[in-house]
């Protein structure tokens, strides 16, 4: 493999793709700040249409539906990433922006139309769009990035998400767009990134792996690689893709069921699912969904600004992980993140229990939340998204991304649905549940998750196939030793 460079073209292409991640983050966080204003809109609109004032239960259920329908749309969208093989990586991202525009228009005009249905339908449509983005973006970035930089560029997916959440928190302030007059603009803002990405995508390359392996366009794939990576010596990478293409020609199309049936796919798909669960069941979204209330319970006078502070920490440590992931490796960072979050979860529980007795415990709670967020962005935040693309070859990758994405969205939905009840009955002890999950995921990662830093897609696939073949001979399930994949030496210039 030749010397690769971080070229402006590579930065441009990955940044444009990451706008889809920004959309996911923005639409995840945008609904929280104007909650009371939207509840008033639901009350007023239904009061005008119904013969009698809407009940408190009906209003609560409609609000919950407005929030949760986003995750339902995400589940649907995540299982539709098969579009990637039909239309190509770049064109698929371009096409689905139509959903962002439709969803944004529905939400943006729901107030002037006095339509609760438009708000809920808009959240569903934008959820489908974001579900597609959670599959499209990490796959595209992984396929256009050099092996030596795949982890660093893969982290840009998570960076886009956290920047989106932070922008939503800031725009949601009452002095900006979170007011009774401008909240539809806050929800409809998602149209602008969609238009910007649609304008920029035609100037981005198609995935060279898709061109060579799926379309058999070797010359064009070679030219794109040379321009993206800033080197003429891409012969080894082209040869690796051709070998993978030959293997694909001998295999039948990989379905979701085949991922669980075939021994060579079973181990990596289980790892992919568990890593996605480790992200959501870590409790991060519970902390962000209800961070304002948590800070308020901890004694913070202006909790909304403390929540934004947590968003800033979120963004800073995502940037830190960009520089760490190719040095420390995926597995190591994930373990550090899980372990640190488990300790912080226990610390949050203790500090919330003792805050009324000791004033300093409020500061301890705030510090625990901020450190918890920092550990999340070191490992469980960015790594599960792009490591799925690394564990599979070109054939099963879209199906694997669909399964992993659906696992993430489903667990996200369940946490959002169940956390309020759990917090009501358990109080501060609710974070002990997340601590137990984090310890379990730490143990799984330590024994089952391989290091993929510096390895080609083909190398990783062969390692799993070798393990599966050996396991079949021994008559037991396939396993992957934690050190069975070691990084190769590469030269990279910035």
UniProtKB/Swiss-Prot annotation:
One of its GO terms (biological process) is galactose transmembrane transport. One of its GO terms (molecular function) is D-glucose binding. Residues 1-10, 85-89, 142-152, 204-268, 325-330, 389-398, 450-494 are cytoplasmic. GO terms for cellular component: cell projection; membrane; perikaryon; plasma membrane. Detected in stomach, placenta, lung and brain. Glycans are attached at residue 43. It comes from the Eukaryota. It is found in: Cell membrane; Perikaryon; Cell projection. D-glucose binds at residues 158, 279-280, 285, 314, 377, 385. InterPro entries: Glc_transpt_3, GLUT, MFS_dom, MFS_sugar_transport-like, MFS_trans_sf, Sugar/inositol_transpt, Sugar_transporter_CS. The modification Phosphoserine is found at residue 484. Residues 33-64, 111-117, 174-182, 290-303, 352-362, 420-428 are extracellular. Transport is mediated via a series of conformation changes, switching between a conformation where the substrate-binding cavity is accessible from the outside, and a another conformation where it is accessible from the cytoplasm. Belongs to the major facilitator superfamily. Sugar transporter (TC 2.A.1.1) family. Glucose transporter subfamily. Facilitative glucose transporter. Can also mediate the uptake of various other monosaccharides across the cell membrane. Mediates the uptake of glucose, 2-deoxyglucose, galactose, mannose, xylose and fucose, and probably also dehydroascorbate. Does not mediate fructose transport. Required for mesendoderm differentiation. NCBIfam families: SP. This is Solute carrier family 2, facilitated glucose transporter member 3. It comes from Oryctolagus cuniculus (Rabbit). The gene is SLC2A3.
């Amino acid at each position: 493999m030749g010397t690769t460079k971080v070229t402006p073209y590579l930065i441009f292409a990955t940044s444009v793709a990451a706008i889809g991640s920004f959309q996911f983050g923005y639409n995840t966080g945008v609904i929280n700040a104007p909650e009371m204003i939207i509840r008033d809109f639901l009350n007023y609109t239904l009061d005008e249409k119904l013969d009698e004032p809407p009940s408190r239960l009906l209003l609560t259920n409609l609000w919950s539906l407005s929030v949760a329908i986003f995750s339902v749309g995400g589940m649907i969208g995540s299982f539709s990433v098969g579009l990637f093989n039909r239309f190509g990586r770049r064109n698929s991202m371009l096409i689905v922006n139509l959903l962002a525009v439709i969803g944004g228009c529905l939400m943006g005009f729901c107030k002037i139309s006095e339509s609760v249905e438009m708000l809920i339908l808009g959240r569903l449509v934008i959820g489908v769009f974001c579900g597609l983005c959670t599959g499209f973006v990490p796959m595209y970035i992984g396929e256009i990035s050099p092996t030596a930089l795949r982890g660093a560029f893969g982290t840009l997916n998570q960076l886009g998400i956290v920047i989106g959440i932070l922008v939503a928190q800031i725009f949601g302030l009452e002095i900006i767009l979170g007011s009774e007059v401008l909240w539809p603009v806050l929800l409809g803002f998602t149209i602008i990134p969609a238009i910007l990405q649609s304008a920029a995508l035609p100037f981005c390359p198609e995935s060279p792996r898709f061109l060579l392996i799926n379309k058999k366009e070797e010359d064009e794939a070679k030219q794109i690689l040379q321009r993206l990576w800033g080197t003429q010596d891409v012969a080894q990478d082209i040869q690796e893709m051709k070998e993978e293409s030959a293997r694909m020609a001998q295999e039948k199309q990989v379905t979701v069921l085949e991922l669980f049936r075939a021994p060579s796919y079973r181990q990596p798909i289980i790892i992919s699912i568990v890593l996605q669960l480790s992200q959501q069941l870590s409790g991060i979204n519970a902390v962000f969904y209800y961070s304002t209330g948590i800070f308020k319970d901890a004694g913070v006078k202006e909790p909304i600004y403390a929540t934004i502070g947590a968003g800033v920490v979120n963004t800073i440590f995502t940037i830190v992980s960009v520089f760490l992931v190719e040095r420390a490796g995926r597995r190591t960072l994930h373990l550090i993140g899980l372990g640190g979050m488990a300790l912080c979860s226990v610390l949050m529980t203790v500090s919330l229990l003792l805050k009324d007795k000791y004033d300093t415990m409020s500061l301890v709670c705030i510090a625990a939340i901020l450190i918890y967020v920092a550990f999340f962005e070191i490992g469980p935040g960015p790594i599960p998204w792009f490591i799925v693309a690394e564990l599979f070859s070109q054939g099963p990758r879209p199906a694997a991304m669909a399964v992993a994405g659906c696992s993430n969205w489903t667990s996200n939905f369940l946490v959002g649905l169940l956390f309020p009840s759990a917090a009501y009955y358990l109080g501060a002890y609710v974070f002990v549940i997340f601590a137990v999950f984090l310890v379990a995921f730490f143990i799984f990662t330590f024994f089952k998750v391989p290091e993929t830093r510096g390895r080609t897609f083909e190398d990783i696939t062969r390692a799993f196939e070798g393990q599966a073949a050996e396991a079949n001979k021994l008559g037991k399930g396939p396993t992957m030793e934690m050190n069975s994949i070691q990084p190769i030496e590469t030269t990279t210039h910035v």
